[in-house]
From Swiss-Prot:
Localization per record: Cell inner membrane
InterPro entries (UniProt xref): EF-4 (IPR006297), EFG_III/V (IPR035647), EFG_V-like (IPR000640), EFTu-like_2 (IPR004161), G_TR_CS (IPR031157), LepA_C_sf (IPR038363), LepA_CTD (IPR013842), LepA_IV (IPR035654)
GO molecular function: GTP binding; GTPase activity; guanosine tetraphosphate binding; ribosome binding; translation elongation factor activity
Name the UniProt record assigns to this protein: Elongation factor 4
Originating species: Herminiimonas arsenicoxydans
Keywords, comma-separated and alphabetical: Cell inner membrane, Cell membrane, GTP-binding, Hydrolase, Membrane, Nucleotide-binding, Protein biosynthesis
Gene behind this protein: lepA
Domain of life: Bacteria
Length: 597
């Protein structure tokens, strides 16, 4: 066991995490040059394309060190994005060490800091590595100073390497072996194994990626999952070197996979503890929690006959994405669809994109909303994740909205514009500190404001230099109202939005004027109104198309013209009573892209 090292790589998007992993795998001979491809561990097309890691992957490698010993290195790849922070914390708790990869030309960024603090909290040894030192604008001393300033770990002997050229990668592994402690654990104790990740394979069912903490596991033994309590027979176990290799046993300190014929991912939750049914462990490993969706949106098929296909696609995605929640929903305007819960905006985009790309779906998405807690007049509490479910204002005692703590990191020249943005989004400043060139701002902000377009705005005000991460803090009473859109005095449920009262008139007017541009002219006048309860806050009219009925009267008597005009007017009035307005699909999307001028 002394020659095992379990480690993961912490890095901001684009600081070269996956490339470094590729180099390490190549150096250890995990794959022949023929099988080597860019970003071996990012197996989803979407992961490669966006350059992000969504699911954790592993590689068990053997490395002959300079001291002549052969070490087993287990690399556990972690996602780097805020939305997947729970998956990161599970990956990190399976390790004893982490390589903190920092781009020598850019310095420390928000996600790195968030994940690094998480690693330090879990007691993981952090080894700083400066990557991309081959770039002409690389500045290693400044980057080291920044690591010490912002994160507060000693970076004087940080390893310098370039994952692209392969320079210094061996030094990284040597530093890893020297600094990271071997795993602790007792191979003879009752089995405890942490599920780091699990995914669904079409041939064998659920594959669980586990870190064995104590005990030993062999095939044909019965295992019990502690959170869900299900008992299954182990069919095969092994390691990924990055291709899978079966083994006769897995013992304490090792990272490998278990296949036990589990049919659904719900049974094998990330963070759960695996133990033997015959000789169970006394208690589960700490840190397991159920993942709660934070952001909700409705997904509707463009063609009504695709509803079943959409349900099947969501089911298949759910097999590989335990954080995705969905339930059927009916909207008068959009027909049948699903209300889906996501971890955050990136997660939502990825799910949408995978549905469109892997399953050929055409989707309409309603505006993302967060979960509000509503206290009713009789004291009962309900959770509202959909504007159309919001009760009548007269029955509501108070509405509480989710507040998050946002950590923002940016170069100091952008502080002013970022603060202005945060104030516009109803943020309350909690803290501000300078670290070298970088500034860290801490704000409390309503989740609803972040969900809308905060991230894009942040990137544009700071020219892409600012980075952020956020975590849920609490529910707080707030003056939010539901704005309904009426078209010819009929409510359209899919257009309802929940906004803060101070912003409601503005948003109502904005949506109404956007709708006016998008609803085609009819043969009768169409009135578009935004209302809060019974108060109408804004109105736009789409003028009717009309035939020139006076074209055939040359000169002639005014009463004749009047008669024709009155007749036309009566006809239009009658049409307005029976006619219905078709709302084009773009109109629903317009609610999403509300650009604040």
């Amino acid at each position: 066991m002394n020659n095992i090292r379990n480690f993961s790589i912490i890095a901001h998007i684009d600081h070269g995490k996956s490339t470094l992993a590729d180099r390490i795998i190549q150096l250890c001979g995990g794959l022949s040059d023929r099988e080597m491809e860019a970003q071996v561990l990012d197996s989803m097309d979407l992961e490669r394309e966006r350059g992000i890691t969504i699911k954790a992957q592993t590689a068990a490698l053997t490395y002959k060190a300079r001291d002549g010993q052969v070490y087993n290195l287990n690399l556990i790849d972690t996602p780097g994005h805020v939305d997947f922070s729970y998956e990161v914390s599970r990956s990190l708790s399976a390790c004893e060490g982490a390589l903190l990869v920092v781009d020598a030309s850019q310095g420390v960024e928000a996600q790195t800091v968030a994940n690094c603090y998480m690693a330090l909290d879990l007691g993981v040894e952090v080894v700083p590595v400066l990557n991309k030192i081959d770039l002409p604008n690389a500045d290693p001393p400044a980057a080291m100073a920044e690591i010490e300033d912002v994160i507060g770990i000693d970076a004087t002997d940080a390893v310098q390497c370039s994952a692209k050229t392969g320079l210094g990668v061996a030094d990284v592994l040597e530093a890893l072996i020297a600094k990271v402690p071997p795993p602790k654990g007792d191979p003879d104790a009752p089995l405890q194994a942490l599920i780091v990740d699990s995914w669904f394979d079409n041939y064998v069912g659920v594959v669980m990626l586990v870190r064995v903490v104590n005990g030993t596991l062999k095939p044909k033994e019965k295992i019990r999952l502690m959170a869900s309590g299900s008992v299954n027979l182990v069919e095969s176990i092994g390691i990924f070197a990055p291709r899978s290799v079966s083994l006769p046993s897995l013992s304490a300190g090792q990272v490998g996979f278990i296949i036990a014929g589990i049919k659904e991912l719900k049974a094998a939750k990330v963070g759960d503890t695996v133990t033997l049914a015959s000789r169970p462990a006394a208690e589960a490993l700490p840190g397991f929690k159920e993942v709660q969706p934070q952001v909700f949106a409705g997904l509707f098929p463009v063609e009504a006959n695709q509803y079943d296909a959409l349900r099947d696609s969501l089911e298949k995605l759910k097999l590989n994405d335990a954080a995705l929640m969905y339930e059927p929903e009916v909207s008068q305007a959009l027909g049948f669809g699903f209300r889906c819960g996501f971890l955050g905006l990136l997660h939502m985009e990825i799910v949408q994109e995978r549905l469109e790309r892997e399953f050929d779906m055409d989707l309409i998405t309603t505006a993302p909303t967060v979960v509000y807690e509503v206290i009713m007049g009789d004291g009962s509490l309900i959770k509202v994740d959909n504007p159309s479910k919001m009760p009548e204002p007269s029955k509501i005692e108070e509405i509480r909205e989710p507040i998050v703590t946002v950590n923002l990191y940016m170069p100091q020249e952008y502080v002013g514009s970022v603060i202005t943005l945060c104030i516009a989004k109803r943020g309350i400043q909690m803290d501000m500190s300078y670290h070298g060139r970088q500034v860290k701002l801490v704000y409390e902000m309503p989740m609803a404001e972040i969900v809308l377009d905060f991230f894009d705005k942040l990137k544009s005000t700071s020219r892409g230099y600012a980075s952020m991460d956020y975590e849920f803090k609490e529910y707080r009473a707030s003056d939010v109202v539901k704005v309904d859109m009426l078209i010819n005095s009929e409510k359209v449920d899919a257009l309802a939005i929940i906004v803060h009262r101070s912003n409601s008139q503005y948003r109502g007017r904005q949506v109404a004027s956007k709708m006016r541009e998008l609803i085609p002219r009819q043969m009768f006048d169409v009135a578009i109104q935004a209302t809060i309860g019974a108060n109408i806050i804004s109105r736009e009219n789409v003028k009717a198309l009309r035939k020139n009925v006076l074209a055939k009267c040359y000169g002639g008597d005014i009463s004749r013209k009047k008669k024709l005009l009155e007749k036309q007017k009566a006809g239009k009035k009658r049409m307005k009573q029976v006619g219905s307005v078709e709302i084009p699909q773009e109109a629903f999307l317009a609610i999403l892209q509300v650009d604040d001028k």
